[in-house]
């Protein structure tokens, strides 16, 4: 069954009444406003649950000072599902320099005044304050996923327990949770056991037979070598084909992480995205102002999930996985047609992509059968020969999307891996030609992040020769096509191992080789469950044990950024 009505999930008592419900089965709570879009996790999960037959409602950004929001729909029959939003609430609320962010792209009106710090903990406490002895509280989303085991927390500069313990919740769904959350809802409805559901974290009083024990909270809090040992085991048990269940002692009880759910197949991904999304802000929240994020995602199409880039500072590997999965052409084209039929659509599809724009349609055959390699990366230090890069499926898809009546422009806004383009000897240049001629809005995003080899090695990023070769070919094709187009370079300051001298060299490179003054320079933020955050806390390369320089002062971190961004006198 494909969901067609209602287009929005209910968020008010009036909507519940119109639907004829006595109460919802499930109430989802989120730190973002309710934008009904396949790009917004809480919306997608809500639609999947509703399509599975569960009466699902959403409460977005509830007020924390009373029950006026949290109690307006009553108590759900099965469970409360809580997400901090599309990004970790502390990342959303604070800059890398510890300053409070004034604006928020997911809050109506744009002011950052509706999402509490540590939103999962705050919302769980809010539920328990007004609903005593309530139904289970289930955590999900990126904040839950990355904080599911003991982790380094940059904002308190400390090792924290699993968010499942700190929020005093009942269950935690990690990763892309469509399968796990439906299985959990069915089990709770039927009174069946839940503790074997894949993709679920639970709490146990006992050790779990057959699962792997990782160093305890007390051990990793007092011993940085134990933290490194813990993270290696955690990171190595994220692939559904090879992962074992894990458990970790936290105080007198144990966190239990079941093995991950199998990745969605193409058919399953299609089914999720073939559900109808309003691609708009719910009218109840629209009265409080516009949501800026909608400008980016309203007319964009997600084509694939996962990333095998494995950049040290990126959390996608732990949340979405290292195996890329993609939707069928048919499903993507049907979504484009639905977008064209929207009254607000003016002819421009702002993006068709995924975490990395040009990973659609090909994967390592060995990985698909046996799982990710435990001892090597797909792209670093060089591209693995087992990965047969082939841009032809993406070229074909883009051509078909351009051919849809009503589509005037189709842009690639997702960042691309230029090393993949250069390594695809058969179709890489054809793809680049397609990009230059049809899919660049004036600037094409690429993320070299740095140019200095010691820093790139710790990041897991390709070297500068491939960057210069790509720039040369992009500029030549743009000139040939008569288009005034540029590359936008995303760069990073203060990554573990990066010194001011490295940033001076980066500045010199951008001036002399790239002929630009960078405008997109971010300061590294140690987010939970990444290798770069492990480096930041331990001050060592986790793969070699080598001691590395870490810039930890806010002043020094800002200085690194300013070295690159300052204009020449």
Q: Can you describe what each PLM-predicted range is?
A:
Residues 65, 194-227, 231-238, 261-264, ...:
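Terminal amphipathic helices with adjacent charged low-complexity linkers/tails
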Residues 41, 60-250, 257-258, 262, ...:
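Glycine-rich beta-alpha loop elements in corrinoid/cobalamin-binding modules
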Residues 88-97, 146-148, 178-183, 323, ...:
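Flexible glycine/acidic-rich beta-alpha junction loops that bind and position SAM and/or redox cofactors
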Residues 24-30, 37-74:
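Nucleic acid-processing catalytic cores of prokaryotic defense/repair systems
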Residues 170, 272, 307, 332, ...:
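Conserved, mostly hydrophobic/aromatic
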Residues 2-23, 33, 228-300:
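N-terminal [4Fe-4S]-dependent radical SAM core
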Residues 28-30, 44, 59, 63-64, ...:
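Conserved SAM/AdoMet-binding glycine-rich loop
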Residues 29-35, 286-315, 333, 340, ...:
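N-terminal pre-triad scaffold of radical SAM enzymes
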